[in-house]
């Protein structure tokens, strides 16, 4: 076999040079991902236009940009703003004028200049609009002297009291001779004692009782039921004197703890260890079973016989549908 013949099963790809012997051990990744030599950054075919003279349109323009002395199509607003600034000299950036009144400024514009260009107006909303009814009926009291006055008990005025008005005929409760020498409490024995609408039940019942009212009741420090029993005494429920020390008390007998007897409950009758679902829903019964557990009725008369024969049923055509005989030209019993 000559050296130039190809091995069976090997094909020449588009990337291989014709006439050369292919390598059958190469994979498809080798043919797909070929190694391409890198190209230099500055391609040899690129020609620089920096040294070329400017076009006639650019020469007539009075404003020349610093981007190769040519108007750039790719320059943006941010690119022209974020550049090195010059703070002095003929190429300095223009300065914003200072406002006349620094306290009344909005942004970088003077408020007076802003109002001169556009006057102050209310916003176009229904909040500031007034209807005819709202303009006539404002709800405020009118100063018309012809309006009728209210004739009734007027509130007392201090000027009328000093002129000898009817308020001088009132007797102060501190100078009432009928109640002089008696203990008097406004909230207890006042004139409005029975008509105090805002007096609570606790303030009316649990009040301060004088000694004259408590003379017919036994005192709290007398011998009571708690003195005989070994019950912890609460303050104001027993003798006001502190009890004797614990060391001088007789020893208490040991307490006999009676065990608590739990009530005996009878066992609940059940049908076995079955849950409610298992007891309620039993498995399917045999179709030939006569008596049912939940429905003790016999099978319907249209069901199969106990010894069903071939093609014999208790009801004619009980198990055949209309579609099975439709269009068959067979006589049907009605």
From Swiss-Prot:
Spans annotated as Disordered: 81-105, 128-153, 233-260
Regions of compositional bias (Pro residues) in chain numbering: 240-251
InterPro entries: Axonemal_MT_stabilizer
Bias (Polar residues): 128-141
Record's protein name: Stabilizer of axonemal microtubules 3
Organism: Homo sapiens
Upper classification of the organism: Eukaryota, Metazoa, Chordata, Craniata, Vertebrata
